[in-house]
Amino acid sequence: MKTEGPRQVGTDKESPARNAGMALSGVEADVTTRLRTKAELEQASGLMDVVCERGNLKLAYQRVIENKGAAGVDGIGIAEFKDHLKQHWPTIKAKLLAGEFMPQPVRRVDIPKPKGGVRILGIPTLTDRLIQQALHQVLSPIFEADFSASSYGFRPGRNAHQAVKAAKRYVTEGRRFVVDMDLEKFFDRVNHDLLMEKLSKKIGDRRVLRLIRRYLEAGMMAGGIVSPRTEGTPQGGPLSPLLSNILLTGLDRELESRGHAFCRYADDCNIYVRSRQAGERVMASIARFLMDKLKLTVNAVKSAVARPWERKFLGYSLTWHKAPRLRIAPASYQRLENRVREALKGTRGRSLSTTIAELNPILRGWMAYFRLTETKKTVEEVDGWVRHKLRCILWRQWKRPYTRATNLMKAGLTEEQAFRSAFNQRGPWWNSGASHMNRAFPKSFFDRLGLVSLLDTMRRLQCVQ
């Protein structure tokens, strides 16, 4: 099990809110149903006309605006986008219908990875994002029927939580080994010809096929220099997740034909088997299949055959018990602590209430994603660590021993306790974790200030699941 959480294929790198899945809104469902019928009727020759339909474009525009995101290489942001479309859309639409539209290069953005290195995103212009979203809405219903029930990423009505629950079920059934496969630089290594071959089996409109090929080959701009692309589907645009699922459906079908129990979320694939020997055989044979049939390479360093509780999948792991329980992987806690540390930088001049207000969305969103956890001890420990950090901020803000003693007395300590604590010559971190600060500023104090409790949030969310 490898990833920290479901990887965001967009301008934001990793958002816990994605666990909500991709369920269609009422308006989108109506449009999608109508487009599905029309697309199926016209996919032989008129699919681009469906893409450019007013209702489809309106829905795509709403999606792009809601997702916000950074500007592309043209520098046009959300605020200017509407006026830009009013001026240029008639020409753009005419080029799309004529099969002559040329996408602009994507803007390179490097996102640091937790363990070093970077994830490369390619941010399209808002115009290209709109067109890709319109394409996605029409193509998705055409290909969705072919996707595997064991594929959970970037699909309507499916999400990371379903994948994690399925993984737990497989282990509970006795598959106590996992083949954790890491596809080496998957989004950078997608073979264009192979992907286009798969697309052409379902899409008859050559204008659509040419446009997708142009998006795949659109250059990437960094430092004012555009680099051509001969492989890969850059993360950052609405079309990339769908294209990855289309290509990796070949892997899903191969695993199904062999009778394997597996979960795939985008390029994260875990296969569950009953013995280490079986796992080693599966690892070797599937690695050959990926290389021979899909032109993809398994990262031998990051991949492994192991016990499920030794790996992590979408930020979760499992306990070793006969009836395993879901737990939050240690690396996921580390990621949260790093985000909290970043949020608490430069807080000396701010009130504690302001700091807590900025911290709460991080804590609330993180726990919303990890609400499936069935172990609470570490959640309690992280709660305590957050309060420790906030007490440390108070201690540092007070600066002088007499100020500290005065504030400790205001918080209820006796004069003797307050002065002994304030003048103990220990450091801020030691004092903020000591008994005098815990008595003066207990959990109830932070509750009154509105600090989100991870444990309380977990219990509340689990009650409504």
Predicted regions and their residues:
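Non-catalytic terminal/accessory segments
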Residues: 1-465
